[in-house]
Regions:
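Charge-dense, extended regions
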Residues: 99-101
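DNA polymerase processivity clamps
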Residues: 1-95, 111-150
Length: 150
């Protein structure tokens, strides 16, 4: 299986919420912060053939980055990562974690319908995150001045 760029971006985002992740069979990925106060869910293009428990998601993403076009083969206890064209013969076997040591949402949370809806593109979010990091701001406040969200 080849992961789309969108799925890799979802995994990178989820790594900022929690370093570990359980991907269940199917095309839905969910994560929850260790404090259990942030939950995220995404539908991805790929359908995962089996449950995969990853203890360190950033480490796993780093392993993927070792390959130009990584192909994932899901085994019983590991995922084998190879190059798409297979010419180099390089491969990496990444062992699954024990799911019992990984923080994962056990059930879906039914959220009320949104009160406010807006679009925040990745360029603006990156700029806001970088600015907040530079001044050490732990939170981000969005205000509506009826014209723009700032």
């Amino acid at each position: 299986m080849k992961l789309s760029n969108n799925t890799v971006q979802v995994l990178k985002n989820f790594a900022s919420i929690n370093q570990n992740l359980v991907i269940k069979e199917g095309n839905e990925i969910k994560t929850m912060s260790a404090m259990k106060n942030i939950v995220a869910k995404a539908q991805v293009e790929e359908t995962f053939p089996k449950q995969v428990a990853i203890y360190d998601l950033n480490e796993f993403l780093g392993c993927l980055s070792l390959f130009k076009e990584p192909i994932l083969s899901f085994k019983d206890t590991s995922v084998v990562i190879t190059e798409e064209n297979g010419s180099s013969g390089d491969s990496l076997e990444y062992m699954y974690s024990d799911p019992s040591v990984v923080t994962t949402p056990s059930k879906d949370i039914n959220m009320p319908s949104e009160e406010v809806k807006f679009t925040l593109d990745d360029v603006m979010l990156s700029k806001l995150s970088k600015s907040a990091g530079m001044i050490g701001a732990p939170d981000l406040l969005l205000e509506n001045n009826k014209l723009t969200v700032r």
